[in-house]
Amino acid sequence: MTMVSRKPRQIVGHVVSRDKMSSTIQQMVDTAPEAKQYCTDGYYGYLDVVFPGKHIFNVHNKKDTFTVESFNADLRHYIPTLARRSRCFPRKLDNLRAVLNVFVKAFNSFASQKELYRSIHPGATIPFSLFDFF
């Protein structure tokens, strides 16, 4: 599970777990930085979670959750273990946690550098990629 920030566009929380229970989600929310609002999809487990800010529970469309869906697509693209369970799976959850920690650190460094570069050079193409941060 992941929590993302729209501005700056970074992963602010992640948990590797065998379940999606409310208590697991609550731990992730408690350790992440506070936000003014939290947008979730229609998963019922979010109803029991206490969010420090406003909670937008959107069951009808993805307009509030497209950012986290985009990050999850990136995770599935760059980490094969998350792409196809039938072909590739982690032997231990600790291994997946370690891989995810490295990815999140590199992804967030890339995102902050990309934002800085765009503020200095508006409209220019970025001369570096995510792989430069591993």
Residue ranges and their predicted role:
Residues 1-134:
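Residue-level recognition of single "structural anchor" positions
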